[in-house]
Amino acid sequence: MTHDIHAQRILILDFGSQYTQLIARRVREIGVFSEIRAWDMSDDEIRAYKPSGIILAGGPESTTEEEAPRAPEAVFALGVPVLGICYGMQTMAMQMGGWVESSAIREFGYAQIKAHGQSSLLQDIKDHVDQDGSALLDVWMSHGDKVTKMPEGFELMASTPSCPIAGMYNEAKKFYGVQFHPEVTHTLQGKRLFEHFVLQLCACEKLWTPANIVEDAIKKVREQVGTDKVLLGLSGGVDSSVVAALLHRAIGDQLTCVFVDNGLLRKNEGDQVMDMFAKNMGVRVIRADAEQLFLGKLAGVSDPEKKRKIIGGTFIDVFDTEATKLQEVKWLAQGTIYPDVIESAAAKTGKAHVIKSHHNVGGLPEDMAFKLVEPLRELFKDEVRAIGLELGLPYDMVYRHPFPGPGLGVRILGEVKKEYADILREADAIFLEELRAADWYHKTSQAFAVFLPVKSVGVVGDGRRYEWVISLRAVETVDFMTARWAHLPYELLEKVSNRIINEISGVSRVCYDVSSKPPATIEWE
């Protein structure tokens, strides 16, 4: 049975909050499609969009300023439920006749709100019970302004000692405002609040599921490319692997993948990619063995940025060479995902609704004259992983740690040589193997070895040896914007160190990186 998984959708208007993408993810986790657009979307665009409900997100501006962003008038005239969060609640109050003032006490961090009234939004939601029987909720606050007068027709929904109007509602119109952030995990009942809004008040069905997303994507790809041939650069990373599996299911032999083996991959990675896609799934994969070409161009180059540019440019040259050998290819497939779309639009214009028509990831030549097919461009990373599993990809492939585009080229400090790459490949493989054996691989967000181009003295038997240093790096993070070094057990680190020094010729010392981000970045270069 075919479902229109976009028919019921929640429109999220972004006023610049760092949490806006979290709102979209929370709605989708419930099983309903949501999309982020800029706050200045026109009234006609909103009416044409036909949302099932609208969420006004937070933002850094002050609604007390005359030039502050305002929600389009159509938001309140459309007749659909509206949820205002933080700044969204404040602009709702101002635009409907209420009042907002700067608060003498800024609230940032944990707070406890007291529920009031009989709103459908907070019905039966509580973390604790007050002495008078009122529901108390543990929430996350982040605001400097506060609503001091509710618009006519609104009732009090929540309060804190320093913010007497921390929530308001108009049940007849299904308008709700909360000063706190239900999208962050610190607000313990945030998911239930979104479920009440999306499933009950907006009356949406749970159609946004991995199986339905796959079905919808296959249908769209077939409509888009018809009987044309499609080319995909397969890296072995999560996004390109999921695109390969999805396109193969959609169009079969019309897909050709090019896998560029640059000599800077992890141990056995090239063989694993070929086994998975060419051997097991029957995907047509061309493997371009370009190790000597890449290492030749990198000889004598130590600057990290120059190394990146050489690796990126050489990849394009190899890919272009393979592409010109193929006949009648009209489409280029890419693993663009939704955060790429949002971020590139925001970077170009400051507005999330100007979606790029050509997301030229990796800087592929403009004169290649391919049309673009991007089957993941609506999806967040966690959704990409979910549909990867739905398509039958192995869990370890779908949930593998991130690997930089330049590969080991930026994990070898300074000049890249084959000797260094071979040593690093073995050290990295030992580290990851032991992490998996100790059940630590999926507890860390990213783990890898780094080759340091310095020699250190070591003692083996009766002899001294002067050899290379390997540093191990493992971090825990939610968003990769900040990260904490992983507190791995000493016994595990000792085992990894002993194996690397004993099993790899040319290594005399192993260190563990205990730097967090910031100030250090996750990768060394």
Swiss-Prot record:
It comes from the Bacteria. Pathway: Purine metabolism; GMP biosynthesis; GMP from XMP (L-Gln route): step 1/1. It catalyses: XMP + L-glutamine + ATP + H2O = GMP + L-glutamate + AMP + diphosphate + 2 H(+). The keyword Ligase applies. Keywords: ATP-binding, Glutamine amidotransferase, GMP biosynthesis, Ligase, Nucleotide-binding, Purine biosynthesis. Gene3D superfamilies: 3.30.300.10, 3.40.50.880, HUPs. One of its GO terms (cellular component) is cytosol. It is an enzyme of class 6 (ligase). InterPro entries: Class_I_gatase-like (IPR029062), GATASE (IPR017926), GMP_synth_C (IPR001674), GMP_synth_GATase (IPR004739), GMP_synthase (IPR022955), GMPS_ATP_PPase_dom (IPR025777), NAD/GMP_synthase (IPR022310), Rossmann-like_a/b/a_fold (IPR014729). ATP binds at residues 235-241. Residues 9-207 form the Glutamine amidotransferase type-1 domain. Homodimer. Catalyzes the synthesis of GMP from XMP. This is GMP synthase [glutamine-hydrolyzing]. It comes from Cellvibrio japonicus (strain Ueda107) (Pseudomonas fluorescens subsp. cellulosa). The gene is guaA.
